[in-house]
Each structure stands twice: as structure tokens, then as C-alpha cells.
């Protein structure tokens, strides 16, 4: 698949275009231009390194939304075996913007749950652009309860702009479904490992992200609102999204510094979409390390650790009036 370049990557796109032209010429010519191709390839690689070393929060947001970025089911195919998808919330419907099911990770049975976007127009519409309705969160709760019953560790993958704000979703109890998931995940008697793989949008993300370990891919985001939404509220214009992204502190490095996540997983040069298999290999190691951390830990110790982790969120300082 031909790589889609973002606006800020146009210098790289131009170089890659020249490289492709030279490769096409070389295939139909007796002239050896391999050295020139190699020179331009090294130049493109260095340019990518330089560009990605100084990304703004808004540019990171664009990478997190890249249309070729691996989604949950892509990682399921690379990281897990014997995946058997489970459907429905047993109350209303099956929301396919959240996928989940039984699988094996390194031979160990587990439960996998994650947001799922679409690749083309038809699939994006079917999966509601990765924005779950209440039945999606209730399906996730059902699968988490099932995992707890059989003592299976839970892996969740976050990639959503946010919970769907439509009238039907609100009528069916969107906020209740999200709130219940927060409560349930805080009390579950089994390990939960969460990875933000793309967008982590507000409560829609948090509803499957109350975990014992929360990791983020290097160029993913996690925030209470999208930059465009924040800009529309504060500045009455979505054009201020770059400034909003800066103010939100939505990047992995900023959130790690604040103690809101536990680990950052580096991405291949140019982002996960440039090397999905390489990204999957890095993610596999991180998930295995996290799972080993909780193996052998008692249920009481696990829940106590989770509670302490949640209670450590946020810092404040008390002052005496007039001091």
C-alpha cells in the first residue's frame, strides 16, 4: 500500500516521489542509478528523523489519526492466536465500534477488547468512526466480567475520538454505561493492561482504560477533548486546534511526566503506519513485560495496587487564606 503523507510531511513525500521515479527508470534502463537511489533514501531517512524529533502536539495528533495507522484488529492478528470474537451486550445490540473476544497471548488464554475504526467509507460508517454507543461499552463490560469469572488477564486497546454523542446513545444511557465500566474495571479481580494505540478521546477512551498498567504508543494521544473541540469552546474556532493541542498536554511524554500513564512504547521511524509489523513486535515485548509483572500477584494485592494507582491521579497544595 502506498504511504499517505500528512501535510507537514510533504518534504519527505517529495523525496520519496523522486526515489520512486528513479526506481521506475532503473527497471527500464541499462544505466545503474542505484547509488543515487541509496543517497536519496538516506537523505529521506535523515529528514524523517529530524522532522519526527521536533513534532508539535498538533502534529502528533495528526499522526495518531493517520488513516493507515494499525487498529485493534491489526494488532490482534499480529500479537494473539486463536482469537474468537464475541458479540453483543445481551440487552440491545452489537456495537462493532468496540471489538473483543477470547484469545491466547504467548500461549496464555486472555480477553482482548478494543476500539475499532474502519479503512474505507463503508466500514468507517459501519463502525461509527470508532465512536462507541452504550451497547459497545456494555459489551465490553460483559466480556470483562467473563474474563474475571475464568481468571483471564484483559488486554484493552484504546483508539477513539470519543463516545458517540448522538441522541439515541444518550437515550440509552451513554453516561451510565461509561460510568459503570469505570466502576467495574476498578474492582475487577484480574489483571488489566491498557495500551493507547491512536486517539484516546475523553470518557470514550477511559471506559476501557481503568487498568493496572496504562501504556501509550509514542505518537498516540490521550485527552479530555479533541483539539478541535477545545478550540471551538475556548476560541470559538476550530482553526485554533494547534494551540489547543499544546494547551491540552495530550502527548505521551507529557502524560508520562504527569504520572498519568506508566510507559511509552517507541514507534518505528515515521510512525506505526510505516512499519506495522515492527510496531507489533515492540508492542508484544511491552505487553509480555507488563503481564509478567502481575503473574503470581494475589487478587487482593492487585486490586490494592490498582486503587492506589488511581488515587495518585492529580496533585494539589493546601494553603492558608492570607498566607
Swiss-Prot record:
This is Acetyl-coenzyme A carboxylase carboxyl transferase subunit alpha. Transmembrane segments: none annotated. PANTHER family: ACETYL-COENZYME A CARBOXYLASE CARBOXYL TRANSFERASE SUBUNIT ALPHA, ACETYL-COENZYME A CARBOXYLASE CARBOXYL TRANSFERASE SUBUNIT ALPHA, CHLOROPLASTIC. It comes from Burkholderia lata (strain ATCC 17760 / DSM 23089 / LMG 22485 / NCIMB 9086 / R18194 / 383). The lineage of its organism: Bacteria, Pseudomonadati, Pseudomonadota, Betaproteobacteria, Burkholderiales. Gene3D superfamilies: 2-enoyl-CoA Hydratase, Chain A, domain 1. Acetyl-CoA carboxylase is a heterohexamer composed of biotin carboxyl carrier protein (AccB), biotin carboxylase (AccC) and two subunits each of ACCase subunit alpha (AccA) and ACCase subunit beta (AccD). GO terms for molecular function: acetyl-CoA carboxylase activity; ATP binding; carboxyl- or carbamoyltransferase activity. NCBIfam families: accA, AccA_sub, PRK05724.1. The keyword Nucleotide-binding applies.
